[in-house]
Amino acid sequence: ICACLVGSEMCIRDRYQLTETQAMVAKLPVLTGDCDTVTMMSYGFDPYLSTWSPYHGAIYAVTESVAKIVAAGGDYSKIRFTFQEYFRRMTEDPHRWSQPFAALLGAYNAQLGFGLPSIGGKDSMSGTFEDIDVPPTLVSFAVDVAVEKDIITPELKAAGNKLVWLRIPTDEYDVPKYDQVMELYGKFREDVQAGRIVSTYALDRHGIAAAVSKMAFGNRMGVKIEHDVDARDLFAPAFGDIVAEVPADKVSELAITYTVIGEVTEDAAFTYRDMEITEADAEAAWKAPLEKVFPTNSGAEG
């Protein structure tokens, strides 16, 4: 999703325009005067999780879309959803009906948990070509209304700032504990409005390492991860969690429950224990998979 403040200088965010944004934010057009109201939109979906469990896939599609709105400075309690569903073709085989049923149960569970409704959607149950089926798909789109001054962009801002990790609690079935999640998201909004958070990123299946890397690319800042961070956590799926950049003197004032996981540095490198990866190498590896499909360099001179 394109994410900039349409109609504002905030469309030019990070210096190198490499930090992927996670929410679209648009000012409302007015003929006279000035309007600081903005609309927001985000999405959530992971095909690998949904293939493993359509139920969990739908739950975390909703949760991820909420987390992205929260991370961008929105108020979760004002969110409304619209869902887009795609499933393999339904036949006389009753087992094929289990996927949409499980996914819709998951989405319903999340709506009840957050107390937020879906106001529409579109579905397709013909996602089969010969013997190829689409993965069970329920994409959640979250929409919200906010104030321009509360919007947070994801690129790292300054060396010396700390990186903190907000983790959402889950139950024994890996389902979010919604009451506690909403409390955390509410406190996160308090921190945003108080100016204690300067950049954020909602985590996905790729975990902390991917998130802080994308945050760093935009202004070519560096990141030093704390030695005591478990290496397994760096790449573990963390749907609903948020990483935030906080000025060092503001960390103790945070309302959220957090773990300090690193620090922003001026060096264009990622450091963890005795390992260091230059940002140039990381950026090249990140761009490589799609370079042949969508070249970032035309090869033209001048």
PLM features: residue spans?
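Glycine-/charge-enriched secondary-structure boundary and capping motifs
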Residues: P100-A110, F114, I119, D123-P136, ...
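Single conserved hydrophobic/aromatic residue that forms the stacking wall/gate
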Residues: I1-G7, I12
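Hydrophobic alpha-helical scaffolding
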Residues: D14-R15, Y43-I59, A72, M90-F101, ...
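Conserved phosphate/anionic-ligand binding catalytic regions in large, soluble enzymes, centered on
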Residues: R15-Q17, V66-D75, E155, S199-M215
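N-terminal small/glycine-rich loop or linker at the start of catalytic domains
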Residues: L28-P29, G33-L49
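Short, well-ordered amphipathic alpha-helical segments that serve as non-catalytic structural scaffolds
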Residues: A58-A72, A103-G106, L184-Y185
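Glycine-rich anion-binding loops of enzyme active sites
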Residues: F45-Y48, K78-D171, I242, V246, ...
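A glycine- and small/hydrophobic-rich beta-loop-beta segment
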Residues: K157, K162-I168, Y173-T200
